[in-house]
Amino acid sequence: EMLRSLVGSEMCIRDRVQPHSNLNAKTRYLLLLAAHVATQSPEEFRLILNRALDDGVSPIEIKEAVYQTIPYAGMAKTYDFLLLTNRILSERGVKLPLAAQSTTTTNTRLEQGIRTQQEIFGTEHIDTMRANAPEELKHIQDYLSANCFGDYYTRTGLDIKSRELLTFATLASLGGTEAQMRAHVQGNLNVGNNRQLLLDAVTQLLPFIGYPRSLNAIAAINDITSKQ
């Protein structure tokens, strides 16, 4: 019975979900990898990673998609997937370590992180958010700017539009992130990812993250895009 259920789900994904989207194969694979990190699904992650490599997604793109989940899912959830990614790449004959993609240093990560936030969300919005933070929480704002944006969004290997879409997919897959999803729906719109792209992303995620999280993600999209 469980096998029939799994086969039925696979057929649904192949015959109904995949065609109902304009996402290219690379984007779909990267979003699904992020979702499987967030949902802690290593066996399916392994299958998708191998399929992605077979279909021409580069090791750097794959590794960067996993890295992009770290500030949202947390290191406790992502560490084993980084190890698993390295193990699969090694099994496939990929020489490790991969070329470094970091562009910031200890001295520049905060400044460049703030600049990246401003590019995505607007200078006035970010400056106001940082200025209005209570004194006892200003260090959190610095952590957010330096780590989330300075350490990850500034990396090469994936462009800013891809990273922002991966962030939305990770948040949707985690669940309980409605406020952050709304913020990153706006972020996606700001960098040029439109409503249809976000809906296409949720459509591809739905079989893996379930209806409640998918419907919450759609609600966030509707909430923000209705105000545009």
Segments the model singles out, each with a brief description of its role:
Residues V57-E61:
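Winged helix-turn-helix DNA-binding recognition segment
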Residues E1-G8:
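Single conserved hydrophobic/aromatic residue that forms the stacking wall/gate
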Residues T27-H36, F45, I62-V66, S162-A172, ...:
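Short, structured motif recognition centered on aromatic/hydrophobic residues
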Residues E64, I70-A76:
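Substrate/cofactor-recognition hotspot
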Residues R46-I48, E178-Q186:
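Short conserved catalytic/interaction loops centered on acidic-Pro-aromatic/His motifs
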Residues N190, Q196-L197:
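C-terminal structured interaction module
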Residues S9-K26, T39, E43-D54, T78-I160, ...:
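Acidic, glycine/proline-rich low-complexity segments that act as flexible tails and inter-domain linkers
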Residues T156, A169-G175, N188:
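Short, glycine/charged-rich beta-strand-loop motifs at protein surfaces that mediate ligand recognition
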